[in-house]
A protein has these predicted regions:
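Conserved AMP-binding A3 loop
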Residues: 33-37, 180-206
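Conserved AMP-binding/adenylation subdomain of ANL enzymes
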Residues: 203-220, 227-340, 350
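Conserved AMP-binding/adenylate-forming core of the ANL superfamily
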Residues: 22-68, 76, 92-99, 148-156, ...
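AMP-binding/adenylate-forming catalytic core of the ANL superfamily
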Residues: 110-112, 433, 438-439, 449, ...
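Structural core segment of the AMP-binding/adenylate-forming
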Residues: 2, 80-155, 169
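Conserved pre-ATP/AMP-binding loop-to-beta segment of ANL
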Residues: 18-21, 153-184, 191, 214-220
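Conserved ATP-binding loop and adjacent catalytic segment of the adenylate-forming AMP-binding
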Residues: 248-251, 328-333, 345-356, 361-410, ...
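Conserved ATP-binding/catalytic segment of the ANL
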Residues: 185, 405-409, 419-424, 428-484, ...
Length: 634
């Protein structure tokens, strides 16, 4: 295929893997299997049904639903009709957030689930351009402008029987550079931007992904990330389709928490070979594994820790595993049979690896999952690049790096003036390739600032080395840089991740310094572990003495990175926090301080807690036991 569209892509791989299972979904407590041929047939019916409802080529259709088969076939139906999908996050709770995206994209139809329908009904009176709301679930009564997906499929069947040629002409008229998707950014200080992704953006990125990550035919991927996110979109179902694999989705619960509880059950039942993950999920997986080990008693826990240390020492940074540590290999195999095989059984027993994205994955987590036999390979990308730029994989991985740059992609590291910096020096990551977006929808100014002479300026900071050609290291955001009073700059993510991953007493952390006299740390405490610590010391956590002790413990965790501490020298002392602002509220999706992949939105945090930041730069606020900190730990 030469520059295929998504339509060409689906037709090609359906012909190749016709009777293989592509979609897996739990219905009435039973997992159902939908083949490649059946998937395409349903996409054809939905696409023809949308045409029968009057959908024109190039029009936009918003899609708001939990992950399920109809999310996939719904999107494919939109694309077969020659239209553009506008995937929306189910985590958008504010009516204004949904309204902006639907109005800004000029959506003329909306596909949604029964669970998400109330959000749509609330804003529909303000959306006169929306002609039809298509509900994936059967309702007793449909309101104005609503219809069920079964009716769309019925209309599609009639349309194909009456004039199949018109439908075929429509989907064959789709060109590689036609828009396939408008993907909205999370947005930080302004309205989110609509990222315009073409058919060729998608198919090019799948080709690129295949150059670094391999999957076997009939492997299963359980998709636990939101399908509206570009990472799940491409690294998930389109890449799996290209290998003849299948995708399963987590059964939807009545609440978000119920859906989360379904994840471990779905993992055991679907026995995935690969999953996509983000750091927040990775930490939860590790926490659950270690809770299970602890429950087996001190002897098992001790053996587990010995096995873990041995495997981590043997694996080193993965690319250099073994070497003079080869004497550990027999122990690695022995402990794997005794300990880690049981851990993997909790993940279905067939897990080969995770692909980590969405945010930087701490190197200790990478070492951990490799040790237990389920490597979590860090990748890097952004929606504007559809999204994959590089990834580690079993054939080539370096812990701490973001992986090998995909094929047919140019990457350069530039300074603030746009000049290429020498190998080893940090600068902005700038990329060029067929996966780079067409631009931002109805925002030519932002497009011109982001894409210059065909090069996408990512806003991320990284470097390359001569020692490992073709690999990229990502170290943070240009916009996240701490800026000292004398203009020096530093990327804070390394310290933040190290502290939150390494300390049981710190749940979340953001460093701040915007040309201030010193750096401060905004810290969300883990109150449960702090209160347990107090009780172990014989101090009531509800007393003033308890409050002081808990704050002292948090300070001790930070001080471990200072001279004399166990982590001394890991990070420059000049950038370590001189004051702590302990916060009374966590960064959550509800207060919009994390995005759909659980990545903290730094700008929003700094705005939300602006008063606490200002207070930390006062004489009273700099003191650890200040009134606001004392109150926050209770």
């Amino acid at each position: 295929m030469n520059r295929p569209t998504i339509i060409d892509f689906v037709e090609h791989y359906t012909a190749k893997y016709a009777d293989h299972v592509f979609l897996r979904e739990k219905v009435n407590d039973e997992w159902t299997a939908t083949t490649y041929t059946q998937t395409r047939e349903q996409a054809h019916l939905i696409g023809a049904g949308l045409m029968a409802l009057g959908l024109k080529k190039g029009e936009r259709v918003a899609l708001l639903s939990q992950g399920r088969n109809l999310w996939v076939t719904g999107e494919l139906g939109i694309l077969y009709a020659g239209a553009v999908n506008v995937p929306l996050s189910i985590k958008l709770e504010e009516a204004s957030d949904l309204l902006f995206r639907i109005q800004h994209s000029d959506a003329v139809m909306i596909m949604t689930s029964e669970q998400q329908l109330p959000k749509i009904r609330k804003i529909l009176p303000q959306c006169p351009n929306v002609r039809q709301v298509i509900v994936f679930d059967t309702l007793e009564k449909y309101e104005d402008r609503e219809t069920g997906i079964d009716e769309v499929i019925r209309l599609g069947r009639e349309q194909l029987q009456k004039d199949h040629k018109a439908f075929e002409q429509r989907y064959k008229s789709v060109q590689p550079d036609d828009y396939a998707n408008i993907s909205y950014t999370s947005g930080t200080t302004a309205d989110p931007k609509g990222i315009l992704l073409t058919h060729r953006n998608y198919t090019a990125n799948v080709e690129q992904a295949r150059s670094v990550v391999g999957i076997d035919v009939d492997d299963v991927m359980l998709i636990i990330l939101p399908l509206d996110h570009c990472f799940a979109h491409v690294a998930g179902f389109y890449t799996m389709m290209s290998y003849g694999g299948s995708i399963a989705t987590v059964p939807v619960g009545k609440t978000a928490m119920a859906t989360l509880r379904n994840i471990p059950i779905a993992i055991r039942e679907t026995q995935p070979a690969v999953m996509l993950s983000v750091p927040a999920l990775a930490r939860n997986f590790r926490k659950n594994i270690e809770s299970g080990i602890k429950a087996k008693g001190p002897k098992v826990e001790k053996l587990y820790n010995i096995a873990l240390r041995n495997a981590i020492a043997y694996n080193k940074e993965y690319w250099n595993r073994g070497g003079w540590q080869c004497w550990r290999y027999p122990l690695v195999k022995l402990f794997d049979r005794l300990i880690f095989k049981a851990v993997r059984q909790g993940f279905g027993g067939k897990m080969k690896f995770f692909v980590g994205g969405g945010a930087l994955l701490d190197i200790e987590l990478q070492r951990y999952f490799c040790a237990v036999g389920m490597p979590m390979f860090q990748g890097y990308g952004l929606s504007e690049a559809t999204p994959i730029i590089c990834s580690n994989a079993g054939g080539a991985a370096i812990f701490g790096s973001s992986g090998r740059i995909v094929a047919n992609e140019e990457v350069k590291i530039c300074d603030s003036e746009g000049n290429i910096v020498p190998d080893g020096e940090r600068g902005e990551i700038v990329v060029r390739g067929e996966n780079v977006m067409a631009g931002y929808w109805k925002n030519p100014e932002a497009t011109e600032k982001t894409i210059i002479d065909g090069w996408l300026h990512t806003g991320d900071m990284g470097y390359v080395t001569k020692k490992h050609p073709g690999f990229l290291w990502v170290v943070g955001r240009f916009k996240s840089l701490l800026i000292s009073a004398d203009g020096e700059k530093y990327s804070p993510e390394g310290f933040e991740d190290s502290l939150t991953d390494g300390s049981p007493y710190v749940e979340q952390c953001i460093l701040h310094n915007n040309q201030n006299p010193y750096t401060i740390a905004l810290i969300v405490p883990n109150k449960d572990t702090l209160r347990d610590y107090c009780k172990q010391q014989g101090v009531d956590p509800n007393t003033e003495a308890g409050q002081r002790l808990m704050l002292d413990k948090i300070q001790a965790e930070v001080d471990a990175y200072k001279p004399g501490g166990k982590h001394a020298g890991v990070f420059p002392e000049a950038w370590l926090p001189k004051a702590l602002a302990v916060l009374p509220e966590a960064f959550t999706e509800q207060n919009h301080l994390v995005n759909s992949t659980m990545k903290v939105v730094r700008g929003k945090v700094e705005t939300y807690f602006a008063d606490r930041i200002d207070y930390a730069y006062t004489q009273e606020g700099k003191a650890l036991h200040n009134p606001k900190n004392m109150e926050a730990v209770l």
